[in-house]
């Protein structure tokens, strides 16, 4: 049975995994109206492989880090599929490199209004921090840099990401290793850059 994959942390990525956790198909949609894209393209993907929700083994989504408005799309979709009694598993983008054998590294992305998210790890030790544009001026990263994708960057991050590895590309190339772990029952709380009440707060 197939597994549906959804990543709405940046733009929309949809995929279908076969019973051996290889990709039937993986499709990315950039710069389109996200809510309409998710519903329309999920329907098209399922139709292309002659599947209905009741035929799925489960759903896997990226739980962040990301913006509330983006992550809520995949969360809401997964909530609807509970009517079909489908299990929902989730994981964080920055977990991917460690699972694939990278013992240390830094995963970086633009966050909320001039802030930048950095997840660093070395073996079993890890840390998370948000830094400002000013902090970037003195930031030194000496290990391998990872990013979600090109759309998760801005000009301020470009000096740090010349040789970066995209976790979206790793996901595309190594689905068995990643989803074999996630489908063992992994479920993460959504990781928003800012709480909803802060993200939608009006500027004074």
What are these regions (language model features)?
Residues 58-88:
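DPxDG-like acidic metal-binding loop motif
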Residues 21-23, 77, 115:
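Short, basic/glycine-rich phosphate-binding loops at helix/coil junctions
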Residues 37, 41, 76, 152-155:
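Long, highly charged amphipathic alpha-helices
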Residues 39, 71-75, 102:
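Conserved strand-to-helix beginnings and helix N-cap segments that scaffold or border functional pockets
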Residues 1-19, 88-204:
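Oxyanion-binding and handling regions
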Residues 1-61, 146-147:
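N-terminal beta-alpha supersecondary unit
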């Amino acid at each position: 049975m197939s597994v549906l994959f959804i990543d709405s942390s940046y733009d929309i990525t949809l995929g279908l995994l076969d019973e051996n956790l290889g990709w039937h198909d993986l499709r990315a949609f950039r710069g389109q109206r996200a809510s309409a894209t998710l519903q329309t393209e999920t329907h098209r993907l399922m139709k292309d492989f002659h599947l209905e929700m009741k035929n799925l083994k489960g759903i896997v989504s990226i739980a962040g880090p990301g913006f509330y408005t983006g992550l809520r799309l995949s969360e809401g979709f997964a909530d609807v599929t509970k009517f079909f009694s489908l299990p929902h598993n989730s994981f964080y983008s920055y977990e991917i490199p460690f699972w694939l054998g990278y013992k240390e590294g830094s995963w970086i992305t633009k966050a909320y209004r001039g802030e930048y998210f950095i997840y660093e790890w070395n073996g079993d030790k890890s840390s998370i921090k948000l830094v400002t544009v000013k902090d970037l001026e003195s930031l030194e990263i000496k290990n391998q840099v990872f990013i979600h994708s090109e759309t998760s960057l801005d000009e301020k991050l470009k000096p740090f990401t010349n040789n970066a590895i995209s976790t979206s590309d790793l996901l595309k190339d190594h689905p068995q290793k990643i989803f074999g772990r996630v489908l063992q029952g992994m479920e993460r709380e959504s990781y928003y850059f800012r709480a909803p009440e802060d993200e939608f707060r009006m500027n004074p």
